């Protein structure tokens, strides 16, 4: 066991929510702003700050309306969520090894609970850090450091697994080992490699080898 503590992002890392998120961004920007924004531009905002900051990139004056329309479209779609193939087997293995597991997400707690109501994953995690629980958001290190503090762990014995440049930035700033996953379907793997992640994996099973 290289790392006693393993932190995970949620969307695009544990759960296959990429298309749900992008379709919700498309719906909100089309409905509120009346224009189609390219998917690559929408995707670039996903995974970092809370949803209000993400929407601010598209229109400073209509953030509240964008968020409202996004959530109206997004929340019912959580009924269709699935975990990525192989993720639960990895979590079971880590649990059996006695590792401390946590989640660090840009989602608010209410939306996390919608996902956990469908997917039986919460039992594996000792802590879940959501967007309303920290003053700063990824790529700032505060969410990662908050999770470590709750777990009584330190950066030198921890890893952070995520699918976005924001995850890698937060992990690097916090001083933990960073693992970028290529299966998230939102951020191009080339962009993840450019972030300086300590390693990039292409399947959940590879986490057993690198961690």
Positions of PLM-derived features:
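N-terminal helical cap/lid subdomain that shapes the substrate entry/recognition surface
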Residues: 2-89, 93-97
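Acidic, Mg2+-coordinating phosphoryl-transfer loop and its flanking beta/alpha structural elements
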Residues: 159-199
């Amino acid at each position: 066991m290289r790392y006693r503590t393993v932190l995970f992002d949620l969307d695009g890392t544990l759960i296959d929510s990429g298309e749900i998120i992008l379709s919700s961004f498309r719906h909100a920007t089309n409905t509120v702003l009346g224009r189609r924004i390219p998917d690559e531009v929408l995707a670039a905002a996903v995974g970092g700050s809370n949803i209000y900051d993400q929407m601010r990139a598209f229109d400073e004056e209509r953030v509240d309306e964008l968020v409202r329309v996004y959530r109206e479209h997004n929340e019912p779609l959580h009924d269709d969520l699935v975990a990525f193939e192989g993720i639960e087997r990895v979590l079971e293995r880590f649990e059996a090894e006695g590792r401390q597991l946590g989640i660090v997400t840009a989602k608010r707690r209410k939306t996390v609970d919608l996902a956990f109501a469908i997917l039986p994953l919460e039992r594996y995690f000792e802590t879940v850090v959501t967007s309303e629980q920290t003053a700063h958001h990824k790529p700032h290190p505060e969410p990662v450091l908050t999770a470590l503090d709750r777990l009584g762990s330190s950066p030198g014995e921890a890893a952070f697994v995520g699918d976005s440049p924001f995850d890698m930035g937060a992990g690097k700033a916090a001083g933990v080992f960073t693992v970028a996953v290529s299966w998230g379907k939102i951020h191009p793997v080339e962009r993840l490699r450019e972030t300086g992640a300590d390693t990039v994996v292409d399947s959940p099973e590879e986490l057993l080898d690198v961690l």
